[in-house]
Amino acid sequence: MIEFTDNFLEEHIAQLIDMQLREVSWKYDYDSVKGGTNKHWHLFLGHNIGELGDFVAIWNQISNNYNYKMERAYLNAHTHGIEPHIHRDDGDMTFIYYPRMDWRIDWGGGTAIYDNDLNGITHHISYKGNRLIKFPANLPHQAQPVSRECYQLRTCVVFKTTRKK
């Protein structure tokens, strides 16, 4: 089931995470598809709750609301001109948190989810600060382009999960 939740975190926690992400030292040259030509900024957070640091509040809220085990978490970022490939994730469920509280709808940068045969987009979820997206990991999906009018970094926090037994 594909769903999204606005105002996922309490406002003051969302603001704190937004500020913390602006201080991250990003690493460039990550590809969402092995051997892919399109790269983006990325920072691996870890495989367990103890490695999440400042971003543990997001996971705590996810685990309070959903019955999934975190396999790994990481940060992704894009700017205008960087368009990741359509790809599928491993695991059972993917959670993407949008932290930028100042993001404008006309900047784009949402997430498109495609049908299994890649005949079309079934869901387009716009980027909105403090929004959590949840979708089955095997569905093809892609971060959407950022407008050339945007001079900000489109950031997200990603959690790859498996169903708890």
Which stretches of residues belong to each language-model region?
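Catalytic core of non-heme Fe(II) oxygenases with the double-stranded beta-helix
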Residues: V56, N60-K165
